[in-house]
Amino acid sequence: MKLFGTSGIRMKNLTPEIAYKVGFAVSQIAKNVVVGRDTRTTGDLIRNSLFAGLLNGGAEIVDIGIVPTPTLGYSARNYDMGIMITASHNPSEYNGIKLFNKDGTSFRPEQEQNIEDIIYNKKNQKRVSWNSIKKVWTDESALKKYSDFILDSVEINKNFSVVVDCANSAGCVASPYLFTDVGAHVISVNGHIDGRFIGRSPEPNEKNLQDTMHMIKGLNENNKGNKYIGIAHDGDADRMIAIDEKGRLTDFDKLLAVFSRYMAEKTGTKTIITTVDASMAIEEYLKDLNVNVIRTKVGDVAVSDELNKHDDAIFGGEPSGTWIHKDIHLTPDGILSGLRLLEMMEFYDKKLYELIDDVPCYSNLREKLPCPDDKKIIVMDFVIKNGENIFDAEVETIDGARFSLDDGWVLIRPSGTEPFVRVRVEAKNDIIAKELLEKGIKLVKDGLNEKK
């Protein structure tokens, strides 16, 4: 696809022309649309162009303003579909457009392809006359409806101390308030709206969260009362990463394992959904519960689709900080996930670091290798054809090529948005991990040299 990547449209300097075309294409399939946006400086520009396209095709619009993506996803249930203007964790010069179904799930690739077909093939294009233009309504109650819904979905009786870092983005309008509403003592960091993300870059990783991590460590050094933990969001608060009482950023894979165990023990579910790039620690950590871990393609769309295939599956996540709680709603929700983290700590009566440190730790290595887009198919065909002999393991082609060994695994998959092929390995020790990575890199390079 020309416009849509693995998570909607995201690009540097997204133009009003593209926003108009997307809006017009959407108007051909939906006549009642709810729209939200994050705090980026180009948000109004993109919104107005999107609105022009929607109106030109006869759609009615409900604007809910600056909201987290999970608020938009929750609100979509009352309309034909939802549109979120956001570039998620990307820097401030980026913006994007993400489309949502009524059930809160993101558009699937075939739905996005249909939008592109309308744009580029001028398929089913119909403009309305001047006297059929619909209205743009404003719903200032959407955020409160979402907040009330989330508060009704969690039960937290213990008093916690939480530092909430919203990256000056959409989470600012909801996350600190909801943590306060459940009785937590909250310190808000980067908690005012600023589309330049002046406090930190919106991707919640170790580099960008250094100040918040040091703050939590300092707060707890001489604190004999409740120890602070940290909750950090990306640019639209559909993701969440936690910082433990020692000021350490929690590993995404370990957090996924802990969440999965909590949901299994609390609800009795025997099915957990995750992606092909998640750690084997999750199977190890859940082994005594006889939980079936089902792996799917990378991306929240694939996780939510797989959740819907299994009635007993109520939780899924991926090691990017994306957590989906099907028993509540199907949109990835960083705020709900942060609150459920408090629920989990209360359930086990343990500190966060105690829960995280209980998860097995394996050696992880990764590398990304330059690969022109027109060579990706050739390279992956070569990897799939030759990888089983190289690794002495059967290949799984759910998403890229994954080789599972007794003491580790290798995942080789092409980037959906960049001219790279990524190699990720995990093993029970550093020596095995290094050997697997070297084999994976050589396999990709040999594929690049393959002539067809």
Swiss-Prot record:
<dbReference type="InterPro" id="IPR023666">
    <property type="entry name" value="GlmM_arc"/>
</dbReference>
<dbReference type="Pfam" id="PF00408">
    <property type="entry name" value="PGM_PMM_IV"/>
</dbReference>
<dbReference type="InterPro" id="IPR036900">
    <property type="entry name" value="A-D-PHexomutase_C_sf"/>
</dbReference>
<dbReference type="InterPro" id="IPR005843">
    <property type="entry name" value="A-D-PHexomutase_C"/>
</dbReference>
<feature type="binding site" description="via phosphate group">
    <location>
        <position position="88"/>
    </location>
    <ligand>
        <name>Mg(2+)</name>
    </ligand>
</feature>
<protein>
    <recommendedName>
        <fullName>Phosphoglucosamine mutase</fullName>
        <ecNumber>5.4.2.10</ecNumber>
    </recommendedName>
</protein>
<feature type="modified residue" description="Phosphoserine">
    <location>
        <position position="88"/>
    </location>
</feature>
<dbReference type="GO" id="GO:0008966">
    <property type="term" value="F:phosphoglucosamine mutase activity"/>
</dbReference>
<dbReference type="Pfam" id="PF02879">
    <property type="entry name" value="PGM_PMM_II"/>
</dbReference>
<dbReference type="InterPro" id="IPR005846">
    <property type="entry name" value="A-D-PHexomutase_a/b/a-III"/>
</dbReference>
<keyword id="KW-0413">Isomerase</keyword>
<dbReference type="InterPro" id="IPR005844">
    <property type="entry name" value="A-D-PHexomutase_a/b/a-I"/>
</dbReference>
<dbReference type="InterPro" id="IPR024086">
    <property type="entry name" value="GlmM_arc-type"/>
</dbReference>
<feature type="active site" description="Phosphoserine intermediate">
    <location>
        <position position="88"/>
    </location>
</feature>
<keyword id="KW-0460">Magnesium</keyword>
<feature type="binding site">
    <location>
        <position position="234"/>
    </location>
    <ligand>
        <name>Mg(2+)</name>
    </ligand>
</feature>
<dbReference type="InterPro" id="IPR016055">
    <property type="entry name" value="A-D-PHexomutase_a/b/a-I/II/III"/>
</dbReference>
<comment type="function">
    <text>Catalyzes the conversion of glucosamine-6-phosphate to glucosamine-1-phosphate.</text>
</comment>
<dbReference type="Pfam" id="PF02880">
    <property type="entry name" value="PGM_PMM_III"/>
</dbReference>
<feature type="binding site">
    <location>
        <position position="236"/>
    </location>
    <ligand>
        <name>Mg(2+)</name>
    </ligand>
</feature>
<dbReference type="Pfam" id="PF02878">
    <property type="entry name" value="PGM_PMM_I"/>
</dbReference>
<dbReference type="InterPro" id="IPR005841">
    <property type="entry name" value="Alpha-D-phosphohexomutase_SF"/>
</dbReference>
<feature type="binding site">
    <location>
        <position position="238"/>
    </location>
    <ligand>
        <name>Mg(2+)</name>
    </ligand>
</feature>
<keyword id="KW-0597">Phosphoprotein</keyword>
<keyword id="KW-0479">Metal-binding</keyword>
<dbReference type="InterPro" id="IPR005845">
    <property type="entry name" value="A-D-PHexomutase_a/b/a-II"/>
</dbReference>
<dbReference type="GO" id="GO:0005975">
    <property type="term" value="P:carbohydrate metabolic process"/>
</dbReference>
<dbReference type="InterPro" id="IPR016066">
    <property type="entry name" value="A-D-PHexomutase_CS"/>
</dbReference>
<dbReference type="GO" id="GO:0000287">
    <property type="term" value="F:magnesium ion binding"/>
</dbReference>
<comment type="similarity">
    <text>Belongs to the phosphohexose mutase family.</text>
</comment>
